[in-house]
Amino acid sequence: MCSSDLNDVSLSIAPGQKAALVGPSGGGKTTLAKMIARFFDPQEGRILIGNTDIRNIPKETLMDKVSFVFQESRLIKASVLENVRMAKPQAMREEVIRALEAAQCTDIIEKLPDGIDTVIGAKGVYLSGGEQQRITIARAVLKNAPILILDEATAFADPDNEARVGKALAELSKGKTVIMIAHRLSSITDADCIYVLRDGEIAESGDYDGLIRKNGIFTRMWKNYSEAAEWKIEKEVRA
């Protein structure tokens, strides 16, 4: 497929697989993810779900098949219940509660004055970036679509929330086809296939072990990531 940001990109993800898209900013990762949701279509080529071109699938049907957790969690000024129920308007209250529990949101709900009926953004009630992400994950849990797209899903998670976000994502991903975009390379070592995008093209692909053995772009990315992580740990210890 081709677009203004992608050039001759071809990949195949089997049902139930976890695929990771990595690479420098501007490499085409988010563009590719948004094409799957038909935020826009490729100028050339096509995207298939099964054997069906997604342009031939009604948008409502396509949206039923895909859930997203994006970089910027978007919560509306409404109750937690209403924010989560956006993904499935007919959901019962008990379903929403179960989704929140699966998304590791119990601690959030317990501290809110009116529990899941608390209006976010009203009367000084605000959530941190990581807490908002967990509410967004609860939406995806409730929707339970077979395809899951995670775009920098832990980007705004503070240290206290990162472990909970990771656990929530692991629960959410069970039994689904997952397409994950991440800079935190430690989160994608278990991916069935990792695609390294650079300048709108797939520069390398393979599983973690195979890419490390190639000693190419991904290996350099991993070394840089590991060194940065070690520096952060050392800095925190000294502090």
Residues of each region from the PLM?
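ABC-type nucleotide-binding domain
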Residues: S4-A239
